[in-house]
Amino acid sequence: MAPRLPARCWRQLSLVERSATHTTTTAAASSLLLAGRTTPTFSASSPSTVFPSLLPQITKRGVKYGWSTLPKRSRPTRFNQVTQGLPAPTSGPAAALKRREKTTPLRTGVLAVKKGMTVFMGRTGARIPCTVLQLDRVQVVANKTRAKNGYWAVQVGLGERRAENVGAPQLGYYEAKGIPPKQTLAEFKVRNQDGLLPVGVQLFPDWFHVGQVVDVRGITRGMGFAGGMKRHGFAGQEASHGNSLNHRTIGSVGGSQGSGSRVLPGKKMPGRMGAQQHTVQNLPILMVDNELGIVVVKGAVAGHKGAVVKVQDAVKKAPPPEEFVEATKQLLNERFPDAEEKLQAARKLHLELKEARRQGLIDSLIKNGLTEKADGNAAVEASA
């Protein structure tokens, strides 16, 4: 409800009430005031006859503040706090996605196994050091959407695991998707919903092309506890001239007065070295082979032999050509035309098996011909 104004405020008003019951218009009232023939009077007991001519005729129901002319604010959602009549917020999930829009790849990446390093001979005879990465049964396991998860991402799995080594909840997770249990799972954020892929499709090395630059992320080899010379490249102390048992020490760690008689945060000191995530950016792709399932990149990659690394389009370079992106999507649709149908069938079978397990009928179903495969997928096999 609109707030009440005291009577002293009404006396200072110089407007003439305009309503259907009065025949005096504003123009006529103004002429009378100029001629000095009349003086407008207002009744302190009827303020409602003044306000219709001063404020717009809008409803105040649902408006929190008295004389606001803004419409009712929309209720903020979990991932979007933008309201009507207000500028876009500079903080929150929506603003964070907007800031990272230009640095988020358009496509998902893949998981690969580092097989080792070798030499690639260029056309001019130059010996180029390179790393061989193998894609071992890389499949799309799930998609994350903006409405449900707050961002767009693709979950990718590498390799396979025996069902005996996987927990029951994870077995049900894979069973509902019709995918065997994966050795490693990883998530790759994409810019929008165009980067999502059908669940169950397999990504081959031709997901990339020769000459493309990629970013490779991996876990560096653990070096254990290392000193300052190995960990940070310190020069060490004097080799002679009175130095005793301090040849590889780091020396002073700070002053006694200017720094407050303390060791400043971030001081480089001996400690555990390695076993941290490291990204090598802008590595050119030298070779792609679908038969061998390998991608050869120039240079070194973090991790030991057999380590799992993430390979994705470079964020600091131009994305792949639009024609190539569309061609790869079309190729996936041709290779897996019934991916959606298989997913729905797997979900239906998962619900049936889940209900059978809940009722304790899974043993009888197995005797009647239903078997659960070792890879975690459930299937109905016709008994001989």
Swiss-Prot record:
Query: According to its UniProt record, where is this protein located?
Result: Mitochondrion
One example of the protein's molecular function in GO is: structural constituent of ribosome
InterPro entries linked: Ribosomal_uL3, Ribosomal_uL3_bac/org-type, Transl_B-barrel_sf
Task: Enumerate the transmembrane spans.
Answer: none
**Which stretches of sequence are listed as region Disordered?**
80-101, 237-262
Cited Pfam families:
Ribosomal_L3
KW Ribonucleoprotein (keyword) present? yes
Keyword Ribosomal protein part of the UniProt annotation: yes
PANTHER family referenced in this protein's UniProt entry, alphabetically: 50S RIBOSOMAL PROTEIN L3, LARGE RIBOSOMAL SUBUNIT PROTEIN UL3M
Family membership, please give it.
Belongs to the universal ribosomal protein uL3 family.
Quaternary structure, per UniProt, is:
Component of the mitochondrial large ribosomal subunit (mt-LSU). Mature N.crassa 74S mitochondrial ribosomes consist of a small (37S) and a large (54S) subunit. The 37S small subunit contains a 16S ribosomal RNA (16S mt-rRNA) and 32 different proteins. The 54S large subunit contains a 23S rRNA (23S mt-rRNA) and 42 different proteins.
What NCBIfam families has UniProt attached to this entry? L3_bact (TIGR03625)
Q: What protein does this entry describe? A: Large ribosomal subunit protein uL3m
